[in-house]
UniProtKB/Swiss-Prot annotation:
Protein name in the entry: Initiator protein NS1
InterPro entries: Helicase_SF3_DNA-vir, P-loop_NTPase, Parvovirus_NS1_helicase, PV_NS1-NUC
Organism field: Aedes albopictus densovirus (isolate Boublik/1994)
Phylogenetic lineage: Viruses, Monodnaviria, Shotokuvirae, Cossaviricota, Quintoviricetes
Entry binding sites for a divalent metal cation: D329, H333, H335
UniProt family annotation: Belongs to the parvoviruses initiator protein NS1 family.
Length: 805
């Protein structure tokens, strides 16, 4: 499939191979050239010489032959010549012809220099026919028939893509998706790809040239003609975004491109208004590069009188790392710009860090929440800040983010090219909004409700508010007044509804967790606040020891008690749905349950609710319930049996229809037996549905004749060494985790297990075991320190006694 041209050039033999079986060599004198002047489509490349290499005469020089009229039927390597008038009688070859035309086609016969090889006698899998045969004649005349291109559409498209890759490799393509490039870069790329002639003059109709002063988008046509279009046509086009490579060369190319772009922009006429946007490609100044597609810009407004005067000094004394943000000073207020995740999940936390860094007051926090919004178009936002006047611009943060650096670069470019007529220094700032025109008239209604909901919800989550009264007690008056100024008197109705929704959401999450998972969460959040490695943690250990001591004094196995709490919470057994703590006054019943169930958040129902006709109206939808001193009578004993068994019952709700109460884990604290007022038969049925623990000793309170009577005179235990908190009960629970679940497995054999009970996941089990190991090590270290301290004290006392003797 290879043709050879033989020519004589000044007495020297020169030959040249054609890279294609049907076209002439390249006019550039390069036999391997693939430029667009030689090859118009990819189909011709199929005929290109690739694998087969028969060599060339020794001493030959590559070049163009002088004699083009020489017969093409002469072959440099063949001693025979095919007559030009010969005609093929048939296009088919029989089996007999093949045997005759391909005789003795072995490695040894075709390549004598390999006659001594080990495989020289093997038949060739592919060989040329014997010279002069019909097969040889057909091969010479019709060798390219099966390689003719079909000129299909995909061949043209493939060639166009190949030329695109050569002209504009990925490292020089813009990252903003519009395929923008400077014409100077076009010239460099065209010269690199071997295109010798491209018109350097600008056309009169579009005004685009190659003088390096205009940024434009580029389209590559099928005939490989480069057309430059203005930004008016490119803006908003949805072209494919080409990702830039991360090689050092690409980084240098990006820097070079950015410097060229900035230089080109500065060369524009100073009378052109930046706001028109005809000379800036969208995305270049919007900060939409590949590096920050996953991030977004956010902004809010903060008046200076809503910040403390000495906030700069306070910021220098903070131990935490300063957040990264930019401030645009507009006199009495500042506009703050920062970057966060595009989904907005982390933006609220970053905003809170910034307001704390600026020492914002309660009114300032409310203002930041109200004016908080997402910046979709960075260039428009900066033009907005410039239009209403700029006093100073500052960037803060120990580590300046790349997105903020890009924003500052954009600000510098826009500020230097600003139109003085657009700057209104004495104008008051309007609230910055980015929205479609059809939504502008609806803003007052929809956005106001959305902003108020977001503000209240953020505050509820921050302060962990679960009731409307907690909102009144915890939230600062300045914050509530600021909300009333913005949204009026309907704030209270929003608060009540949002609090109810948030409480229901939390209850649904707690319902799906075991007590072990809740205890581990407490450790993850609170343990580091109460335990400091290398320091004196004896107070923490003393409270834990006191809890174990209290159970021991009441003759209650603490592991058994904790195991049954883990059974009741996930509804593990059928027909057992309640736990009762019975004991004398001040025995520590409520102390234990309040700290053990602090994160379970049960609905608390006191005794006075028994006189109400709606005493169970809090239970529909509740995750758990805690009764204090309930009164079980023959009238309501049936309801209590169903409740303690875990059956679904219906209850009356004020101004509503009856609502069902699903199975709800129940805890009860009482000073007298709960079955005192019911029949003996009812008593046994109730006791089958509960787990009962009796506390016999009271915690020492105060030495007073009115509080200490004969009943508890000899049944006192010491007061705790400190305030008992949920973290202490969590440590006691997790420290005995394996023993608790070992006991639960034993109890499973004696009870009917509920198939719908909540199960402990393997991940939570592994985390609890890790915590148990860590707590045991800490306990051992503290005990060792305590023993060493006691030994030292004993030695000192013995030394004193020896000295006195």
């Amino acid at each position: 499939s290879t043709e050879y041209i033989r020519g004589i050039n000044e007495g020297r033999v020169s030959s040249m191979e054609s890279v294609c079986s049907e076209h002439s060599p390249c006019e550039h004198g390069n036999i391997e050239c693939e430029c667009i002047f030689c090859w118009e489509h990819d189909a011709q490349c199929k005929s290109r010489r690739r694998e087969l290499d028969l060599g060339e005469p020794t001493g030959s020089e590559r070049g163009m032959a002088n004699n083009y009229e020489q017969s093409r039927n002469e072959d440099l390597y063949c001693t025979e010549t095919v007559p030009s008038s010969a005609a093929l009688q048939a296009n088919t070859i029989t089996e007999r012809d093949i045997r005759e035309d391909f005789t003795d086609q072995t490695v040894d016969n075709i390549y004598p220099q390999l006659h001594s090889g080990s495989r020289a006698s093997e038949q060739l899998e592919f060989a040329f026919p014997t010279i002069g045969t019909r097969s040889w004649e057909i091969l010479i005349r019709q060798s390219y028939e099966h390689l003719k291109p079909d000129y299909k559409e995909e061949d043209f498209q493939s060639h166009i893509r190949r030329v695109r890759r050569q002209l504009f490799p990925e490292k020089t393509m813009d990252n903003n998706g519009s395929q923008a490039s400077t014409t100077q870069m076009l010239r460099d790329d065209i010269e690199r790809c071997g295109i010798e002639s491209i018109a350097d003059s600008a056309s009169e109709d579009n005004g685009d040239g190659v003088d390096g002063t205009c940024i434009s988008t580029v389209d590559i046509q099928g005939n490989c003609i480069v057309n430059a279009h203005g930004n008016e046509q490119a803006t908003g086009s949805k072209t494919r975004k080409i990702r830039a490579t991360t090689t050092p060369e690409s980084s240098e190319s990006k820097k070079h491109k950015g410097s060229n772009n900035q230089q080109n922009i500065q060369e524009q006429s100073s009378t052109t208004a930046i706001a028109d946007g005809h000379d800036i490609v969208d995305g270049e100044l919007d900060g939409r590069s590949e590096s920050n597609r996953e991030t977004a810009y956010y902004t809010f407004v903060l008046h200076k009188n809503n910040c403390k005067e000495d906030w700069r000094y306070i910021a220098t004394t903070r131990a935490k790392q300063a957040p990264s943000f930019i401030t645009f000073d507009h006199g009495d207020h500042i506009h703050i710009l920062f970057s966060s995740s595009n989904t907005g999940g982390n933006s609220t936390r970053v905003r809170t860090r910034i307001t704390k860094f600026l020492s914002a007051t309660s009114a300032g926090n409310a203002e930041a929440t109200i004016t908080f919004s997402k910046v979709k178009f960075l260039r428009n936002y900066i033009l907005y800040c410039i239009r209403y006047g700029i006093e100073t611009v500052n960037i803060y943060g120990n580590k300046i983010q790349q997105q903020l650096t890009e924003a500052m670069d954009t600000f510098k470019v826009l500020f230097e090219n600003r139109d003085p007529n657009d700057v209104i220094l004495d104008a008051g700032c309007k609230l910055y909004h980015e929205e479609k025109k059809e939504y502008q008239q609806k803003r007052c209604g929809q956005r106001k409700q959305q902003n108020l909901t977001d503000i209240i919800l953020d505050k509820i989550k921050e302060k962990k508010i679960t009731t409307a009264q907690q909102w009144e007690n915890i939230i600062e008056p300045e914050f509530k007044i600021q909300l009333m100024k913005e949204f009026g008197l309907n704030v209270d109705s929003y608060v009540q509804r949002i609090v109810r929704i948030e409480r229901t959401r939390i209850q649904q999450i707690i319902k799906s967790k075991t007590l072990t998972e809740i205890m581990v969460e407490i450790l993850n959040e609170e343990y580091i606040k109460n335990f400091t490695p290398g320091e004196d943690n004896s107070k923490l250990q003393n409270i834990i020891q006191w809890i174990e001591y209290m159970f021991k004094e009441n003759n209650i196995n603490i592991i058994h008690f904790l195991a049954w709490n883990e059974i009741i919470k996930p509804k593990r057994y059928k027909k057992i749905n309640g736990m009762v703590l019975e004991g004398i006054t001040n025995a520590g019943k409520s102390l234990i349950l309040d700290n053990l169930l602090a994160m379970v958040k049960p609905e608390e129902i006191p005794r006075e609710r028994d006189n109400s006709g709606f005493h169970l109206d809090q239970l529909p939808g509740a995750g758990s319930v805690l009764f204090e001193e309930p009164m079980i009578t023959p009238v309501n004993v049936g309801t209590w049996k169903l409740l303690l068994e875990g059956k679904t019952i219906k209850t009356d709700v004020k101004n509503k229809d009856k609502e069902p109460i699903e199975r709800t884990p129940t805890w009860i604290t009482t000073a007298t037996p709960i079955t005192n007022n019911v029949h003996m038969n009812e008593t046994s049925q109730i006791l089958q549905r509960i787990k009962l623990y009796i506390f016999k000793k009271s915690i020492q309170h105060r030495e007073d004749k009115y509080t200490i009577n004969a009943q508890i005179q000899n049944k006192l235990i010491s007061r705790p060494p400190g305030l008992v908190e949920p973290i202490h009960m969590a440590i006691v629970f997790v420290k005995n985790f394996k023993e608790i679940y070992k006991l639960i497995e034993e109890e499973d054999n004696a009870h009917t297990v509920n198939e719908k009970a909540i199960r402990l996941s393997e991940e939570a089990k592994q985390e609890a075991e890790e915590w148990q190991t860590a707590l045991q090590w800490n306990t051992m270290e503290e005990e060792q320190k305590e023993n060493e301290k006691q030994t030292e004290d004993q030695d000192k006392e013995s030394e004193k006694e020896t000295a006195t003797q």
